[in-house]
A protein has these predicted regions:
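Histidine/acidic-residue-rich, glycine-tolerant segments that coordinate divalent metal ions
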Residues: 2-23, 29-30, 42, 47-172
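Hydrophobic transmembrane-helix microenvironments that flank and shape a buried ionizable site
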Residues: 25-26, 258
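DPxDG-like acidic metal-binding loop motif
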Residues: 32-39
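Metal-dependent amide/peptide-bond hydrolase catalytic core
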Residues: 132-264
Length: 264
């Protein structure tokens, strides 16, 4: 993100060559420190423990995720359970939440690329305007989410960008829509992927355009759903700790869920 942190507790020691474009602000430096510290503590008690613990450091989250390569590497090991942790600003500092059930949302990207035929703005009749097509797609897709998702379920669809031409009197050849949707029910998430893809194709056909870069069912990041048994162990172990708390589930996505797909 093109911003700089303004709430550092100490003077910055490490500086990027492009500091104005390197802020992510999800606290991943904290995640790295937490995992390293946990590994150091566990290693100091290795003579008292059984089994093998693998520490996993993901190189990205949501976009540019490192989970696919990590899962491929972990396939050679017999993984019994996955533990992931994410800092969250909505919780009080010094608290920990280990509730069972859905905790963080599944997600998929929406980025249909509409192709038309450009021309001069004075003669739209001689062009196939992908901007009009993309704008109508936004309305169609947003409306469909309120009508086609199962009652009682929620799929949050956030459209964030519509990129077409760069001047006011030239109709572009292409126009691209960007966005994301989040869900806690995997089947509803798959339904949403199929829905926005179908709407993109039908809207493109209606305006004489073509469309590609539709979302793929295989690229969906599933929701993070804590196993009741594992979460129960953690809650029981920490029942005497005053910093255990309960928190609302988050619509932010976490690739920890991808790791959970490889466990019993």
């Amino acid at each position: 993100m093109p911003e700089n942190e303004c709430n550092l507790a100490k003077e910055r020691v490490v500086r990027s060559e492009t500091p104005e474009t390197t802020c992510h602000a999800c606290g991943h430096d904290a995640h790295m420190a937490m995992c390293l510290t946990a590994g150091r503590i566990l290693n100091s008690h290795k003579d008292e423990l059984e089994g093998i613990i693998y520490l996993c450091f993901e190189e990205g989250e949501e976009n540019n995720t490192g989970w696919p390569a990590m899962l491929k590497e972990l396939e050679k090991y017999a993984i019994d359970a996955v533990w992931g942790i994410h800092v969250w600003s909505a919780m009080d500092s010094g608290t920990l939440c280990v509730q069972p059930g859905p905790r963080m949302a599944g997600m998929s990207w929406v980025q249909p690329h509409f192709h038309g035929r450009g021309g001069h703005g004075s003669r739209p009749d001689l062009s196939i305007n992908p901007t009009i097509c993309a704008a109508n797609y936004l309305v169609n897709a947003a409306t469909a989410m309120t009508q086609k998702i199962t009652a009682g379920e929620t799929v949050t669809c956030g459209f964030t960008s519509l990129k077409g031409g760069v001047v006011g009197n030239v109709i572009p050849d292409d126009c691209k829509v960007l966005g994301t949707f989040r869900f806690f029910n995997m089947e509803e998430g798959k339904k949403a992927v199929r829905l926005v893809s179908d709407i993109a194709e039908h809207t493109a056909a209606m305006y004489g355009c073509t469309v590609d870069e539709l979302p793929d069912l295989d690229e969906i990041i599933p929701p993070t759903v804590n196993d009741p048994y594992i979460a129960g162990i953690l809650e029981d172990a920490g029942s005497s700790l005053t910093f255990l708390t309960r928190s609302l589930r988050s619509k932010a996505g976490s690739c920890t869920s991808a790791g959970m797909t490889m466990t019993p």
